[in-house]
Amino acid sequence: MPSISHKPITAKLVAAPDATKLELSSYLYQQLFSDKPAEPYVAFEAPGIKWALYPASEDRSLPQYTCKADIRHVAGSLKKFMPVVLKRVNPVTIEHAIVTVPASQYETLNTPEQVLKALEPQLDKDRPVIRQGDVLLNGCRVRLCEPVNQGKVVKGTTKLTVAKEQETIQPADEAADVAFDIAEFLDFDTSVAKTRESTNLQVAPLEGAIPTPLSDRFDDCESRGFVKSETMSKLGVFSGDIVSIKTKNGAERVLRLFAYPEPNTVKYDVVYVSPILYHNIGDKEIEVTPNGETHKSVGEALDSVLEAAEEVKLARVLGPTTTDRTFQTAYHAGLQAYFKPVKRAVRVGDLIPIPFDSILARTIGEDPEMSHIPLEALAVKPDSVAWFQVTSLNGSEDPASKQYLVDSSQTKLIEGGTTSSAVIPTSVPWREYLGLDTLPKFGSEFAYADKIRNLVQISTSALSHAKLNTSVLLHSAKRGVGKSTVLRSVAAQCGISVFEISCFGLIGDNEAQTLGTLRAKLDRAYGCSPCVVVLQHLESIAKKSDQDGKDEGIVSKLVDVLADYSGHGVLLAATSNDPDKISEAIRSRFQFEIEIGVPSEPQRRQIFSHLTKSGPGGDSIRNAPISLRSDVSVENLALQSAGLTPPDLTAIVQTTRLRAIDRLNKLTKDSDTTLDDLLTLSHGTLQLTPSDFDDAIADARQKYSDSIGAPRIPNVGWDDVGGMEGVKKDILDTIETPLKYPHWFSDGVKKRSGILFYGPPGTGKTLLAKAIATTFSLNFFSVKGPELLNMYIGESEANVRRVFQKARDAKPCVVFFDELDSVAPQRGNQGDSGGVMDRIVSQLLAELDGMSTAGGEGVFVVGATNRPDLLDEALLRPGRFDKMLYLGISDTHEKQQTIMEALTRKFRLAADVSLEAISKRCPFTFTGADFYALCSDAMLNAMTRTANEVDAKIKLLNKNREEAGEEPVSIRWWFDHEATKSDIEVEVAQQDFEKAKDELSPSVSAEELQHYLKLRQQFEGGKK
C-alpha cells in the first residue's frame, strides 16, 4: 500500500559541504519519521530550490529546528543559513538518467561505470539519489531523469547514459542559477530597529492570495501587505503590525504588514499587495511609517487606527455585467458578502470587484424555479466580475479625503448611480488573483493584435469626442482562430470593457423585431463608453442575396443603424467566418478589415507557452501547476501542430495533462508511493513528457484531420527509397537551403519552391514526395485532380485557392499534385464548354507565382506526371515548376539491388537469400512498382509455403494421435502448445524470390521506355 502523505514542517538549513545526507535534529527527525522507516527520505524547499530529494539521517547534536546538507550541486547557493520547508517522501527508483560530461573530461569519463565511480564521493553509499539538474563533480550535469525528476539509484535497475557536453551558449535556466541578488548574501540585523522612522518602498502586485494568521472574516484582506522579514526588521515592526503608507500625491492609507512566507525569492524593499489595492494606491513607490511607538499587531483590529464611516456610496462601473439585469441578484449578493462579515478600509475612488459565476447567475435570474440555489454558490467558480467604485464617504466626494472603515453595523451603505471609470488593465494580474481564467497575451508574433490595439486606443481615447467612427471587420476562413479572443485580450490590456452581441441571437420573427433587439443592445453598450462592441457572426443578419445580387430588405435598415451608433468613444467591431457572404453595403461601412488566419508556427509556439505556463495550482492533482520536462521542445510542439486552431491546441494540452495523470496513477500502483510524493519529486508540478504530448497530438490529428483539413507528416524516410541518390541531392539543394538559410531570401532573392517529377509510372514519384516531407518534418498535402472540380462557376478556382491557403496555414508544408497533367493540361485544347480547366490552370499559375514571394515561405509544391508533354507550357517557366527531375528505371543491377534492400528492410530473410543474385536476373525494364510487386509476391510465397508446412505438421500429428486412440487437435491448440518459433515467424527464402520473379511481367515495355527517354531529352535538352 502507498505510504501516507505527511504535512511539511519548517526549519533552518545549515550548509555542510561534506554531508551526503540531509541530517536532521532529533526533534525534526521524530516529527517526520515517528514510525522509524528503514530508509528515510526527505525533500526540502528553499529560496531558489524547489523540493530537492535527500536521504535523511538523525544528528542529535543539532539544535531543535535545524538541519544540514550539502546543497552546492543543487543550487550553487552561497548562503550559509536559509529557511526551508521539509517534507517526508517515499521516492521511486530512477529507471534512466542522462549525464553530460565536459569535452575535456569525456576521454576519461565516457562510460556509465567511470561516471558512477567519479560520483561516489558525492553520493550516499547506502541510499544514493540522483536529481535532474544537479551539477556534479568534474563539471558533469544530470540532464534527464525518468520516470520523475529525482529518485533512488539502484544498481542493476538504473540505466545511465553518458553524453559529451555540447559547446553551446549557456541556457537561460542555467544562467539563472548564477544571476543572484547580491542583497541576498548581505548580513542583516534581525533584531527589530529601535527607531521607527518612515522608509520608502516599492509596490508590486501579488498573483495569488497568501495565507496569514488572520481569517479573512476577521480582517480586510485588501489592506494587507507582505515584505521580507529583513525589510520588517529595517522598518522596526513585527509581522502583523499596522503601518501607515503615503503616496507621492499625499494620499494616506493603513496597511497590515506581514512577513512574506518562507522560503521565497521576493525582492527586498518591495511591499507586495493585492492587485486591487495596487491599482487603488495608484503609485509604484510609497512611504511606509510605523504607527507610533507602540506596535499595532495581529491582535489589534483596523478600527483601532481608522474611524468607521457613517455613510458610503457605491456606484456601478458601467460594463457588460453591471448593465445586465439578470446579474443584479448575483452582484448584490456579492456586495453583501464583501462588506457584511468584515470591516473594510476604503477611500474615495477605490474600485471594488465582485466576482461571480455568470452562467449560474443568469440561470437564477431568468428561472424562478432555481431561486432555491444558495447565493454563496455564485462565487465558487467565478468567470465574470462586476466592478463598483466608492464615490462618496460621509458625504465627501473629494479623492483627497481620508480613509474610513466600512462597518456593516454602523455604516449606511448606499448603492446607486453609475460611473464610466476604466477598469484595471490585465497588465496587473487581478484575474489570476480573483481566480478567473487568464486571457492570452498577443505578442509581436501576432501583427494583427498591434493593429487592433491601435484602433482600440484611438477610438476610446480623449480624441473620441471628434466622432472618429472607427469600425473594423475581423474575418477568417476557419472557425476558432481567435477573433473574439484577441478583441477581449487587447481591450482588457487597455482597461476597456467588451460588449459581445451574437447576431444569431438577434434574429426575430420579422425585420422590425431583429432591428429592435439590435438597437436595444447597442443602446446599453454605447451607454458604457469607452468600450468595444463586437457583432459576432455578422453574415447571419447581413447576407448578400444569392439570386439576383440585390441585398435583403433588412440590409438598408441595418446600414442606418450602424451609422447611428458610430463614434462616441466606441470601437465597433464585427466578426465573420465568411466575409464574402456579407452584403457589400454593410461591408463598406467598416473602415478596416483584418484577416486572422490559422496560427503560424511562431504563433503556435507562443500559444503553447501560454497554455503550459505554470500557475498557482490547487489542492488536487487535476489542479496542480504543470511544467515541461527538459526534453520537451515548444518549438517541436508548434511544428507538429501545423494547421490546428487555438481550441485544438488547448485540447491537446488538456489531453496531455490527463495522460500525465494516468501515467502517474500507474506509477503509484507499480511502486510504494503516492501521487503527492510523485508531484514533489517533480518539483511540485505535474510534469508533461514528450510521450504525453505525442499521444495527445496523434489523437488530435486523428480526431480533427477530416473535419478541419489538418495535414499530417507522413512516415516515409530515405531508407524506404532506393536507387535515387542523384535525385536526392537535387531535392536537398532545392528544399534544404531555404529552410536552413531563410535570411538569404529576405533581400529579394526568390527561392525555387516548385519541383516536378516526371517519368514512367511506378518509379516512386509519390513515395519520393512523402520522403521529402518526412526528412524535413514538413506537413504533407496530397491533391488529386477530381477533388478540385466543382459544377458551380468559380468554385473550382476557389478550391485551388483553398488548397494553397491551407498549405500556408500549415507551413512548413509540401503540396503534392499527383497526375498533374489531369489538373493542369494545356489551355485552349479542352472541350469543356465552360472553360473550367483553363481557369483552374490560370488560378494554379497565380498561386505558384505567390509561393516565391512573402507569405509563401515554407511552402513547397511538388508535382508528378507521366506525361509532361501534356502540361501547360506556362507551368514550366521559372518561379513555378522550374526544377524538373526525371525519375526513370534503374539502369544498373546495383541500383536494382538498392531498391530491393529498401523494400525488404522489415523482412526476415533466410540465410540463402542473395538480393544481388536476384537483381542480376531482373531486366532493366523493371520499375520501382515492379520490384515492390516482386518483394510482395515473395513474401506471399513464403507465407503460403510456411502455412503448407504447418498444415502438414498438424496432419501428421493428428494421424499419430488417431493411431494412439486420441482426439485430433485444432490449429489453435497446435499453435498454443506445439508450434516453434520457425512456425510462427515467416522467413523469406531464395526460392520464394525466384518463383515471384518467374511469374512477374514488367509494367513498362522497352518501346514505352524509349518514349520516356525521348521526353527526357526534349525537356532537359530544350529547357536548359
UniProtKB/Swiss-Prot annotation:
GO terms for biological process: protein import into peroxisome matrix; protein import into peroxisome matrix, receptor recycling; protein unfolding. One of its GO terms (molecular function) is ATP hydrolysis activity. Its EC number is 3.6.4.-. The keyword ATP-binding applies. Its main location: cytoplasm. InterPro entries: AAA+_ATPase, AAA_ATPase_domain, ATPase_AAA_core, ATPase_AAA_CS, P-loop_NTPase, PEX6_4th_dom, RecA-like_PEX6_r2. ATP binds at residues 759-766. It comes from the Eukaryota. It is a peripheral membrane protein. The keyword Membrane applies. CDD domains: RecA-like_PEX6_r2. It is found in: Cytoplasm, Cytosol; Peroxisome membrane. Component of the PEX1-PEX6 AAA ATPase complex, a protein dislocase complex that mediates the ATP-dependent extraction of the PEX5 receptor from peroxisomal membranes, an essential step for PEX5 recycling. Specifically recognizes PEX5 monoubiquitinated at 'Cys-6', and pulls it out of the peroxisome lumen through the PEX2-PEX10-PEX12 retrotranslocation channel. Extraction by the PEX1-PEX6 AAA ATPase complex is accompanied by unfolding of the TPR repeats and release of bound cargo from PEX5. Interacts with PEX1; forming the PEX1-PEX6 AAA ATPase complex, which is composed of a heterohexamer formed by a trimer of PEX1-PEX6 dimers. This is Peroxisomal ATPase PEX6. It comes from Yarrowia lipolytica (strain CLIB 122 / E 150). The lineage of its organism: Eukaryota, Fungi, Dikarya, Ascomycota, Saccharomycotina. The gene is PEX6.
